[in-house]
Regions:
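TPR/TPR-like (Sel1-like) alpha-helical repeat modules
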Residues: 51, 99, 107-134, 159-167
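Terminal, low-structured helical/coil segments at or just beyond the last alpha-helical repeat
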Residues: 132-212
Length: 212
């Protein structure tokens, strides 16, 4: 009887865990849609709810991001720099290679007055994102990698910004604006690459079906 009860309890725990993860994913998708159209308050609410449901939730395949990166980035976009810093540091404590989180941590620090550490984090985030895009487009060039940053627009922008950081006179307003553009552009690229891959597969499938 004890063994049976234990099995039932375990099954219930697994079921509830799966439900929480599914609900978290639904909130993340809604949050991303809100975030990408600039509805930052709504995005923050969705991401925060997802973190409450499943604090270990990770989104994505090619560019994996934990939920605290999303909470922190949306908090930054609402101007809540204290919440942003806490969440972004938590994201990086879970995975130090969360380069979008690092980029936004740098932005948060810079806009909170700590430009010295801020520029280091921005630079580190940019370098990490560049390396990730290079890896995705090279290692997976025969699969989903061929749909990422196809014109090299993101990587070229990163190279220009890194050169600006290394220059003598750093234009902070431009760096912050460019970094915010980069953060959103990379997030958009997730959807664009997925869309292009899906359309390509549909064309291939349609072509095969039409063959005699």
């Amino acid at each position: 009887m004890k063994a049976l009860n234990s099995m039932v309890f375990f099954a219930v725990v697994v079921f509830l865990s799966g439900c929480a993860s599914f609900q978290a994913g639904t909130n993340v998708e809604a949050g991303r849609k809100a975030f990408l159209i600039g509805n930052n308050e709504a995005a923050f609410g969705y991401f925060q709810r997802a973190a409450e449901l499943d604090p270990t939730y990770v989104y994505g395949v090619a560019l994996r991001q934990n939920i605290w990166s999303y909470v922190g980035r949306s908090a930054y976009s609402t101007g809540n720099f204290s919440q942003a810093r806490n969440s972004l540091e938590k994201s990086l404590s879970i995975n130090k290679e969360e380069d979008l989180a690092r980029l936004y941590l740098g932005l948060t620090l810079a806009r909170s007055g700590d430009r010295q550490q801020g520029v280091k984090e921005i630079q580190g985030g940019m370098k990490g994102l560049y390396d990730q895009l290079e890896y995705i487009t090279q290692a997976y060039r025969y699969s989903y990698g061929q749909y990422w940053d196809t014109r090299g627009e993101i990587r070229s922008a990163i190279q220009r910004d890194l050169a600006m950081i290394d220059g003598k006179d750093l234009d902070w307003q431009k760096l912050i604006s460019n970094s915010e553009w980069l953060g959103r552009k990379v997030e958009e690229e997730i959807d664009l690459a997925r869309r292009d891959e899906r359309e390509d597969r549909l064309r291939d499938s349609s072509g095969r079906d039409s063959q005699p």
